[in-house]
């Protein structure tokens, strides 16, 4: 750049005042009259100049791209030599090691990349902001900049004090949110003080003693290297703990195996993309908040200072929350519309007289949603049960109660529907609370029907039609509905002569377990007794259950007789009449997650020797990092394949047959039990194939019809008539043969007994 003419001095954003960084001719200047406040934010040089955080003083003529390109290295240098930024980068580099800690379940490479990105971005933001606050506190008077000796002393005090406080609070960090927050804050101060001390020490050595000019190479690269060294220490400590306490489920890695350069490149890209996205969101929020602050000051005619900044962030936060709520509602509405669509695999109402929507039913086929239609169309027939059990069987009853009407009206409809289907003539009635989308595990329903030899009635009262994550606000209604249905059925059963009265049970899995179990949240097991509930089975009880939390804190308060039993697998359950059996896997994140894990250590993350099986002993609980990993454990809780049962996470298919026998005291011989297990797997695989084939074929025919319509030709069906001079295409012939061999198309939508 030239040297003639008036010159304008550039500035850095270091805390405490204006520091000259470069000097350029005024006609090439973009930013003028800018300074920073005590935490490194842009601020006006005086009252009436620029507003906080806004780029003022745009000069004319507008700079060319070439001039801007010459300024970029200076701006980058200004950014990367800022102590707060450097502390943030060091914290971000260190956070990579905790990001690779083992959780309850393995993560995919793509998920691991997102974990790294979120952790790095979060630790950067927290580290930079905390060090800026420490620097401001050390400087004392606004506008004053602390010297390097004072900053080193501040780093030593905050780092050492934070370390001592963290050590003192650690044993009780899981006792309450107050102690957890204090412990997490102390840990943050300790690591930030250490990082700040390393940054200031490297500054003194590189720039004062050696005399190097500040640059990216003498600042940021050193900081990242120091962060990596801290990460190495974390990994070393983790390995020492593993050797001391042993590896739990050593075959379960933190991340599923990664193969190939392309896979690693994908991970790197996702990591950078995640961090970039979060950073862009933060910058956008900051920019919006500063613009709002300028508007507020124009309206009031006065500078609002920190109050204005705070109000602006509050307004921006409220706006983001409103957008999130609107987006959530859009997702909910879209899901509801999807739930109303009739699937190709289940196109017509059932023909069975013992299921809802059949000839004897009071329920309309389009009123029960996708999962309800699947449920009634997949019911077993007496002959199918006989084929597996080798004993005479009857057709079981399945009733689905739609969510239209009041709770009392739905309870009355449940009784009327059972009457119409012959449910009160069965020996076992189970009120099964579904998940949010209306789903009741098909494996559970079929296992019950096999074990009862068809002499059973399943009632499903629907309280929502959206995935469980979107139905959390419907669980109170679901619990009220469950209790009302149980009470209405119990009253009807009391009118039956004692010798012919069916036994009443309840069942719930996942969110359904929360809904069913929470009937006992007020009144305990005694309330279930008052509703004539003989016993209950609850698979994968979520952490949100009120009854679960009460029972966990004080078991006698809700269950003085000890009839609520918790086991990780059903073969460990005792033989107790009237038992309410909770089966929860040791590695089920749906049960072990907690919103407070952001800072508070959960009970199962205690001393290594006290942790439940399947919980890694070498992993330390860390604020933020452990919470992010737990979120991905939730996402991976239901990774399962049709027909392949495994005791893992939130998948309880492998436990259901035995759990039903233990809780409801149903019987089977070893040979029958094996036959049931085989049939459950075969039917699940068959139905999954049926849905896939029907959906794919339906889409294919729809695409063909669209094309033929454009050609002016008639639409086609699944039948392909062979002509003398035209053979059926080999691919089509193969598809039709596969469907014929497996009898898939013949079973789609079937619900009545075989002809």
Can you describe what each PLM-predicted range is?
Residues 3-10, 14-18, 39-52:
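Compositionally biased, low-complexity flexible segments
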Residues 4, 23, 35-38, 60:
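Serine residues within intrinsically disordered or low-complexity segments
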Residues 41-42, 46-80, 84-89, 95:
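Intrinsically disordered, low-complexity N-proximal targeting/linker segments that flank membranes
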Residues 77-140, 144-502, 522-755:
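C-terminal His-loop and adjacent cap/lid subdomain of alpha/beta-hydrolase
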Residues 508-513:
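Gly/Ala-rich beta-loop-alpha elbow adjacent to hydrolase catalytic centers
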